[in-house]
């Protein structure tokens, strides 16, 4: 999947040649294929990309655990990939998924469940939006641990 390439090849060519960062990762944005809602942002290494393409399930690389993981392997909240796109310089991918249940480890449909809003004075605050929990993370992750 990797290799040297010219700017023209990267931007206009048809070869998938991801541009991994110094840590060997690309950013992945996952959206709901039906609604277009952003579900989560994560990272993929070369193996996660390969497994995602080969299996049709979303695979990611955990920077904190330094390990591959298949979305839903602990929670059962699987992401089936319907389409994968790459950006112009191939350093990020966008996957349109069929989400089963919640995408966020907090039990919510999306990891983007808080809006940033202007607070009193010059302050900035967060406000919950679409924050309903679809599962209790304490129950799900304790049972799998």
Swiss-Prot record:
Gene Ontology biological-process entries: L-histidine biosynthetic process
UniProt cofactor(s): Mg(2+); Zn(2+)
Compartmental location: Cytoplasm
Pathway: Amino-acid biosynthesis; L-histidine biosynthesis; L-histidine from 5-phospho-alpha-D-ribose 1-diphosphate: step 3/9
Xref: Gene3D superfamilies: 4.10.80.70, Phosphoribosyl-AMP cyclohydrolase
Catalytic activity: 1-(5-phospho-beta-D-ribosyl)-5'-AMP + H2O = 1-(5-phospho-beta-D-ribosyl)-5-[(5-phospho-beta-D-ribosylamino)methylideneamino]imidazole-4-carboxamide
Cofactor descriptive note: Binds 1 Mg(2+) ion per subunit.
GO molecular function: magnesium ion binding; phosphoribosyl-AMP cyclohydrolase activity; zinc ion binding
Residues binding Mg(2+), per UniProt: 87, 89, 91
Domain of life from the UniProt record: Bacteria
Family under the similarity heading: Belongs to the PRA-CH family.
Subunit structure, as described in the record: Homodimer.
NCBIfam families: PRK00051.1
Protein name per Swiss-Prot or TrEMBL: Phosphoribosyl-AMP cyclohydrolase
Originating species: Nitrobacter winogradskyi (strain ATCC 25391 / DSM 10237 / CIP 104748 / NCIMB 11846 / Nb-255)
High-level lineage: Bacteria, Pseudomonadati, Pseudomonadota, Alphaproteobacteria, Hyphomicrobiales
């Amino acid at each position: 999947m990797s290799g040297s390439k010219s700017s023209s090849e990267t931007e206009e060519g048809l070869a998938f040649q991801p541009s991994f960062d110094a840590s060997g990762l690309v950013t992945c944005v996952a959206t709901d294929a039906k609604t277009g809602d952003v579900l989560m942002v994560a990272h993929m290494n070369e193996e996660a990309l390969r497994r995602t393409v080969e299996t049709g399930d979303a695979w990611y690389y955990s920077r904190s655990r330094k390990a591959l993981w298949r979305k839903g392997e602990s929670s059962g909240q699987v992401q089936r990939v319907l389409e994968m796109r790459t950006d112009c310089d191939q350093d990020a991918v966008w996957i349109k998924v069929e989400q089963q249940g919640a995408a966020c480890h907090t039990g919510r449909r999306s990891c983007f469940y808080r809006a940033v809003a202007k607070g009193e004075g010059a302050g900035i605050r967060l406000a919950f939006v679409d924050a309903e929990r679809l599962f209790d993370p304490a129950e799900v992750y304790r049972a799998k641990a």
